[in-house]
Structures are given as C-alpha cells and as structure tokens.
C-alpha cells in the first residue's frame, strides 16, 4: 500500500518556533536518529517512525556522520527511507548532520580539521543521497585544531551550497562566543547551538542558552530524557531490555543511584498529578522555556514517538509545580 502523508500534518499538530534571528522555523519536537536507526534496526520500523513523525508535523530530522551502529548507518537508513518515500518531499524537510567525533581510522577521521569536516559532509551527502543538508554542525570543540580552521570550514561549506546553515554543538561558552562572532563577521551567522539539556542537566542555564540568544542563535536540546532516566521505565528497578542493562549502552547502572531514583519517583508524582507521564512532563518542561527552539527526541517505535508528542500540548505549569520541580532537581 502506497504511503500518503497526512493532509492535516500542518493543521495545528505541531508548534513551530523561529530559530534565533533567522527566518527558519523548526518544530518544537525534532526526531533524532542517534539510536535505533543503525544497521541492527528493522528497516520497516525505521520507515514507520519517519512517516509517523512527518504525519505529525515533525519536519526536522537530526543526524550525524557517526550515528549508527555502525557509524554512518543511520544516514544510510534515512537516505533509503527518503528514496522509497518520495511523497516526503525534500523541500518540506530540515535535515541536519554533524562531524567532529571519531568516524574512520587514521589521523583524519576525528576532530575539527578542515579535512575532517569537508570530507565527512561529502560522505554524509552520499549516504543520504542528498545534494545538501539544511544544517551542518561542528559536533564538538576540538582543542587540537585552531578554532579558526574549524569555523572557516563551516563558512566555506555554507558558501558552497552543501549546507544552508552552520551550527555548533557542545562547545564551551568561551569558544561558542568566539564562534558566534567569527561566523557573523563572515556573513554566515551561526543558526543554532545544540546542547545536552534536561531536568537532570541544568548546566546550559548558567550561560550557554542565554549566550546563544544574545548572539541571535537558536538553542536545540538533546538528551531531554537523560538517556531514558526521565521516564517511567526505572520506577521499579532495571528492566532486562533497558539501556542500563545493555553493556554497550551509554547509560550505566551506577547512574541510577538511590538519590537519582528518589528524584525520579518524586518527579513521577508531579507528572501523575498533571495527568502526564514522566517523559511527557520532562519534555513539556523544556518546551516551557521560550529560549528553547526545539527538543530532539529519540524513539524505538512509532507508538513511543506518538506518546512523547503529547508533550507539545501540555497543560501550563503552575508556579507551585515549577518550584517543586526545582526543589527536586537542583
């Protein structure tokens, strides 16, 4: 049966926010392909998630050269999905990729050198079967490469037409400030900063989010559920099929300390009183911040994606709820 995009996908299902001072609107929720789109994932499941996301107003798909497993596999999967679903029209999508983490062996497969960034983008475009990406990020600050070299590579990539906008991710505040000024002076203003931000990671509030706003850049939050801790999944221990239970996973059992578990249970009580799951409330709390342009979520199924999308129509937080949440998390 041929797939047809939902005709009402832009009829109020998803709010869109302006990204910094640019003309680009991004959905409040973006779909990240960090997990669950590698070569161990079922193609039909991946395709169903992309279709479901598009049908519900998600137009921004967040990738990187090393997303997998294996590195590059998520981009290949995404490219195959776009080829098999021409009804998901390229002009309706914002596709981002990144480079900076280890990608291939040898001295040129990691870091922020001009060679690494430009070569990586060429490979990403081939894997996704695209002529350009909308946003290309320097995925991390590389202290072993002159920052001017990394940033000039972004400038030249945008000027070449192989990316429409430049972004930075996980940069320290000092280096981010330098990047904003360098890029603006060369008429390629930084569109967006992407950083780890959640109820359990409030560090960006100290400077990063405000700094991005002051320089006219948007802010995109990733890992909004703290790698799954901010869900109902661990209320009664560690399930056998959870991320913590996997030895190769990023989340480790020691991160679920008695103190963290107590916080999870207290937040769960507030969410229940609001008529939400903990995950929905954690996402809604991020969307409550007017300086957050978009929140990147992951999903392992279309059903999980739909459950998390409920967060975009959240009930407003009361002052009492916000105080209680801060008391638990800070």
Per-segment meaning from a language model:
Residues 1-93:
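N-terminal binding-site loop/beta-alpha segment at the start of enzyme catalytic domains
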Residues 41-45, 73, 77, 108-116, ...:
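Alpha-helix N-cap and loop-to-helix initiation/capping positions
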Residues 41-53, 112-128, 176-180:
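Short, acidic/polar
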Residues 20-38, 96-109, 132, 137:
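N-terminal small/glycine-rich loop or linker at the start of catalytic domains
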Residues 27-31, 61-63, 93-97, 136-138, ...:
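Hydrophobic faces of well-ordered beta-strands that scaffold small-molecule active sites
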Residues 125-145:
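Active-site groove signature of glycoside hydrolases
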Residues 2-13, 145-330:
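Beta/alpha (TIM)-barrel catalytic core signal, keyed to glycine-rich beta->alpha loops juxtaposed to Asp/Glu
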Residues 37-42, 66-73, 142-146, 173-174, ...:
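Acidic-and-aromatic substrate-binding clefts and catalytic sites of carbohydrate-active enzymes
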